[in-house]
Each structure stands twice: as C-alpha cells, then as structure tokens.
Amino acid sequence: MNDTPDMQSFYCAIGLGNPKSPSNVGSVVRACGCFSADHIFYTGSRYDRAEPFYTDTANQRNEIPLTHIDSLTEAPVKPEVKIISVELCENAVPLTDYRHPEQALYLFGPEDYSLSQETINKSDDVVFIPTTGCLNLSATVNLLLYDRMIKQTKVLSHIEANDLIRSSRDCRNNLIVKD
C-alpha cells in the first residue's frame, strides 16, 4: 500500500486580513506562485485603494486568483479545508513542530495589527513562527509556504533537483557547482 498522498488531494490557500501594502501583496502573490498555492483571499478596503501601485514582477497574478471576501473564516473553500491562523498568539504551535494538513487555508493578519480573537477561535489550528520580534507579512507567508513544501514533498533526486533549478532560475543564471 502506498502511503504517499496524491498531489491532487493537496490544496493551499492564503487569506490576508485587510492588507495595507501593495508591495507586500505582490510579494505574497509571487511566493504563492513559487510554492504552488492555489488561491489568495483578502478582506478589507485598504488593498483595493492601493492596488494601482501593486507590484508583481513575476506576473503570478495571472496564474493565482486574488479574491476579495468579507470574512477570512468564511472564504469559499471546501468543508474539508482546515483553517490555520498564523499569528503570534499564546498557546499557538511553533511552526517547526507543526504538521500541515493536506488541505489548508492559512490566515494572516494585517501588517499593522493582528487577526481578531474571533478568527483565532474559529481556526482549526493556530501556529506561530518562532522569532525574536515580528516578521514582515510577506516574509511570514514565504516561511510558512516553504515549511509546508519541505514537509510535504518527497526528497528530490539530484537529477530532479537540477531540473527544478533549471526551470525556476532566471534566464541569465547558468551557475553550476563544480565537483
């Protein structure tokens, strides 16, 4: 019997609570493209006002839906999707110890505030990234998505890793580690 989950069973979405900075949202969109997230939801009106200044240098926005919703905990996802809040919250699980569900909606508070207690209460899990001080929103999303990827991906062979590197790097990068 094969215990490896079918990649089709994986779903990953990001929920941003009233994001303020278009550059942060642009960085989140790029991270979602790099780490194969499926959807980005956001609440509030600040991003809509800032959207003309949006930065997405990798054009990931055409690949990943970015949808305004009224409430993060009521995002239109399947019932089996777990809601995971990522917040500096007492009694939260350190990300280093967390086992990600196959299907998850990860919620992040705004750059200048936190998720609400109501959102925390409605979450299936709450995790935090052990740091001294708080991280930037896009840095937090990047770390979370990287952690999810490394914990759910099989170890790549050397050949597979090189194929991934070739398909991911900038066209001017032809670097090789010499034996």
Name each model-derived stretch:
Residues 34, 119-160:
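Structured adenosyl-cofactor binding patch, chiefly the S-adenosyl-L-methionine
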Residues 28-30, 54-57, 97-101, 120-123, ...:
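Short, glycine/charged-enriched secondary-structure capping and boundary segments
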Residues 1-87, 149-154, 158-179:
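RNA substrate-binding interface of SAM-dependent RNA methyltransferases
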Residues 45-47, 72, 110-113, 130-135:
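Short, acidic/turn-prone active-site loops that include or flank metal/cofactor-
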Residues 89-122, 126-127:
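Active-site/ligand-binding-proximal alpha/beta "capping" segment
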Residues 25-26, 51-53, 94-96, 116-119, ...:
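Short glycine-/acidic-enriched loop or helix-start segments at secondary-structure transitions
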Residues 71-76, 91-92, 134-136:
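A short acidic, often aromatic-flanked loop/helix-cap motif at beta-alpha or helix-coil junctions
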